[in-house]
Swiss-Prot record:
It comes from the Bacteria. Disulfide bonds: none annotated. GO terms for cellular component: cytosol. This is Alanine--tRNA ligase. The gene is alaS.
Length: 865
């Protein structure tokens, strides 16, 4: 039996023998592609190559690509564990041609690999082609020798692939394996095609057309090939098993899952879920994703939590999920060394997330059970599902799973509507919303000269105004200018674009930002003088002060990155950065706040390298060579075959395309200005360098001097004086709280209480107290009365604050939240809360007595009903 590991290697070796360049799998996070949540196909890393935006030094490639389908349009999560072939994470075997070979060679390679290399019986194989693709038919029939009846024409989108509404597209041919008569299902194109007998094992896409906005197509000058074959699926065929979960790799993970969960039934779908999900979670964490409440981090969190619940379902009594990492590393670490490198981070992340979830899941299940007891039909509302998500961290699919087990369904549309309301929070927008890739001619190329000069004579290649290509632009008009060569650095790798001027005879163009599209460098700004025309000769001048300040900050991030690893540990990986002339911002993985002592160590390390005045050296070498030298490749970046390596003495070596100082001493001084959390497991440091670091130090010193002057203190007794003052404040606050309580108690005689049968109703305004005091009084009423409704307000100038309490025994008659809404309507306010407790405030205290009178009527009307 051929193992999954052997099959993976056999595929690579075969295509390398056919002059294909073996390219490593790209990250599960598609860099620079906002259209995808995760990499879900082998062609994703080559998308810009197919579009003609990016050039490679090879025309044939072979990959084994990590893929994930668990979010967005491509989402297999709900089916995982319940079918034979659905997965969140999977490996896609692929061979690619970029304007090299086409249909004859692509089909021949696939057929030879299947029938000669891995020896699949020819009689077990069937193929489909696009209905009108006679060329593919001829290759299969005349060249390969496949019988006509085994070639099925399909006239549907199943056999025609496109990258989008516009762009490269073309017909497909698919190869199917027949599992035999004992398995239900019919041939592709028949009504029974959805059965499991005939399984697609290889899809070959022929990108030969370019689809235009009007729907028409034209031939591509260089047709290409994109193929994909699921490793798990072809492994199942070769290992003579029907389900992907029966292959060697999954069986090892399933056995481990049974061991750590103490499950009794090895065939439980829950064990398949766990075995699948550990792969997805481990690879996501290794690629830099950490659990969060939105975006990719939320997808990871929901996968982790789904696995945990399935573990609990089959008997797990303690945290278990992280215990599968060792087995996963054993199975896949040889092919993916990142699993070995990131093992500690993966295990720590899973342990932390599982502990966090176990703290909340019990409460969430109680809420779920309480809600379904009151159901009037078999549908759980979207509002309840959202409450479970928002308050208890339950992913929607977890709620749906729990509902399905009880024969119920969830209103997903209403849940999504609630999610959409929540998402209306403002988010940081980019500076530009123009799709420059579609705007700029893909053949245009700008040569960047800015590493060695800030001034360059250049020629105007293209001008864009209002998203349109124009021959010239006039004064005071915003435009985008493309030059044949430029010293301007385009925003990339966290470093902002340069600013400066393009000037020529009779014109001046102020460059406000610089972006890149393919190989074109875009100078974005405004013509402030004269007229600018195509082919004009000009001088491009980068503003030197911002560039030099930015370079100092960028070099400092490299030193900071290494210092973080030395002080905090190797897990401190870069998650993002922003470098401009004023500051640097650096995001990295770490699961707790950095102590003052650690910050001091980090600053000391960085400043030691600055004082050492190491030369900052640059070399361009192959990516393979750079990695062998130990160069840090940063998360999310997309690197070419030849990479630029920046070294600072023996301290730091990183792949980087940004601009840097000549010597570390040029940074001057490094000072951390802030440190904090931006997401679960992700911290952010902000810092300044050079003159700004000195000014920051002066500012802090001046603040300390001002504090000493105010407290009449000196360097020796300042801390003691501050501690003494804080202790005095604390004692005074206790005294104030005591006086407020006494004030409220003294006012109790003036508070009107109404008894309606055995229900006590209290509605009153009490001045001179705070909300905490009101809340304590409400709790006091509720503890001393089994049936009480209490509404207490306090006013300060025109502001009103209120607290409302309703005994649990009365919440079926009236809810505190409803009373809050009624009161808010009379005081220009808002408020809300639970059925038994609510609070809020308003901006109109003038009519507080009238408002309370209306609220009392509202209460009495409700309880009398």
């Amino acid at each position: 039996m051929i193992t999954t590991k052997e099959l993976r290697n056999k595929f690579i070796n075969y295509f390398e023998s056919k002059n294909h360049s073996h390219q490593p799998s790209s990250s599960l996070i598609p860099f620079g592609d906002d259209t995808l949540l995760f990499t879900n196909a082998g062609m994703v890393q080559f998308k810009d190559v197919f579009l003609g935006i990016e050039k490679k030094d090879f025309s044939r490639a072979v990959t084994v690509q990590k893929c994930l389908r668990a979010g967005g349009k491509h989402n297999d999560l709900d089916n995982v564990g319940y079918t034979a072939r659905h997965h969140t994470f999977f490996e896609m075997l692929g061979n690619f041609s970029f304007g090299d070979y086409f249909k004859k060679e692509a089909i021949s390679f696939a057929w030879e690999f299947l029938t000669k290399e891995i020896k699949l019986p020819v009689e077990k194989l069937w193929v489909t082609i696009y209905a009108s693709d006679d060329e593919a038919f001829d290759v299969w029939h005349k060249h390969i020798g496949l019988a006509k009846e085994r070639i099925i024409r399909i006239d549907s989108s199943d056999n025609f692939w496109s990258m989008g509404d516009t762009g490269p597209c073309g017909p497909c041919t698919e190869i199917f394996y027949d599992h035999g008569e004992d398995v239900a299902g019919g041939l592709p194109g028949t009504p029974e095609q959805d059965g499991d007998r005939y399984i697609e094992i290889w899809n070959i896409v022929f990108m030969q057309y370019n689809r235009h906005a009007d729907g028409s197509t034209t031939d591509l000058p260089k047709p290409s090939v994109d193929t994909g074959m699921g490793l798990e699926r072809i492994s199942a065929v070769l290992q003579n098993v029907h389900s992907n979960y029966e292959i060697d790799l999954f069986q090892a993970l399933i056995k481990k899952a049974q061991q750590v969960t103490h499950a009794k039934d090895i065939n439980s779908p829950s064990l398949k879920v766990i075995a699948d999900h550990i792969r997805a979670c481990a690879f996501l964490i290794a690629d830099g994703v950490l659990p969060a409440n939105e975006g990719r981090g939320y997808v990871l969190r929901r996968i982790i939590r789904r696995a945990i619940r399935h573990g609990n379902k089959v008997g797990a009594k303690e945290i278990f999920f992280y215990k599968l990492v060792a087995e996963l590393v054993s199975q896949m670490g040889e092919a993916y060394s990142q699993l070995i490198d990131k093992r500690e981070l993966i295990e720590k992340t899973l342990i932390k997330e599982e502990k966090l979830f176990l703290k909340t899941i019990e409460n969430g299940i109680k809420i779920f059970d309480a809600e379904i007891e009151n159901l009037k039909d078999n549908t759980i509302s979207g509002e309840v599902a959202f409450k479970l998500y928002d308050t208890y961290g339950f992913p929607f699919d977890l709620t749906a799973d729990m509902a399905r087990e009880k024969g119920l369904k969830v209103d997903e549309q209403a849940f999504l509507a609630q999610m959409q309301i929540q998402k209306q929070r403002s988010k940081e927008a980019g500076k530009f919303n123009v799709d420059y890739n579609s705007l700029i001619n893909s053949q245009v190329k700008s040569e960047f000269r800015g590493y060695s000069t800030l001034i360059e004579d250049a020629k105007v290649l293209e001008i864009y105004q209002d998203d349109q290509l124009v021959a010239s632009t006039s004064e005071q008009v915003s435009a985008v200018v493309v030059l044949d060569k430029t010293p301007f650095y385009a925003e990339s790798g966290g470093q902002v674009g340069d600013k400066g001027i393009l000037e020529g005879v009779g014109f001046e163009f102020v460059v406000e930002d610089v972006q890149k599209s393919g190989e074109a460098i875009l100078h974005i700004g405004k013509l402030v003088k004269g007229r600018l025309n195509l082919n004009d000769e000009l001088t491009a001048r980068v503003s030197d002060k911002p560039r030099l300040a930015t370079a100092a900050n960028h070099s400092a991030t490299h030193l900071l990155h290494k210092a973080l690893k030395l002080v905090l540990g190797g897990h401190a990986e870069q998650k993002g950065s922003l470098v401009d002339e004023d500051r640097l911002r650096f995001d990295f993985t770490h699961d707790k706040a950095i102590s003052r002592s650690e910050i001091e160590q980090i600053e000391l390390l960085v400043n030691q390298q600055i004082r050492a005045n190491y030369p900052v050296t640059t070399i361009e070498i192959s990516q393979q060579k750079a990695k062998s030298l130990g160069a840090e490749a940063l998360f999310g970046e997309k690197y070419g075959d030849i990479v630029r390596v920046i070294s600072m003495g023996d301290f730091s070596i990183e792949l980087c395309g940004g601009t840097h100082v000549a010597y570390t001493g040029d940074i001057g001084l490094f000072k951390v200005t802030s440190e904090g959390s931006i997401a679960s497991g992700v911290r952010r440091i902000e810092a300044v360098t050079a003159d700004k670091a000195i000014r920051h130090t002066f500012t802090n010193e001046n603040k300390i001097i001002a504090i000493k002057d105010s407290l009449k203190a000196n360097d020796i007794n300042l801390i003691d004086k501050i501690k003494s003052m804080l202790e005095q404040i604390k004692n005074q606050e206790k005294q104030i709280a005591k006086l407020k309580k006494e004030l409220l108690s003294g006012s109790s005689n003036d508070i009107k209480e109404t008894n309606i049968g055995d229900i006590k109703v209290v509605v009153a305004n009490v001045d001179g107290v705070d909300v905490k005091t009101l809340r304590n009084k409400i709790d006091d009423y509720k503890s001393k009365n089994t049936k009480v409704i209490a509404v207490l307000t306090t006013t300060n100038a025109d502001k009103v604050q209120f607290v409302i309490g309703v005994s649990n025994a009365l919440t079926t008659l009236i809810k505190a939240g409803d009373i809050a809404k009624e009161l808010s309507s009379h005081i220009d306010g808002k408020g809300g809360g639970r059925a038994d407790m609510a609070q809020g405030g308003g901006n109109n205290s003038a009519n507080i007595d009238q408002a309370l009178s209306q609220v009392e009527k509202f209460i009495l009307n409700n309880i009398k009903e």
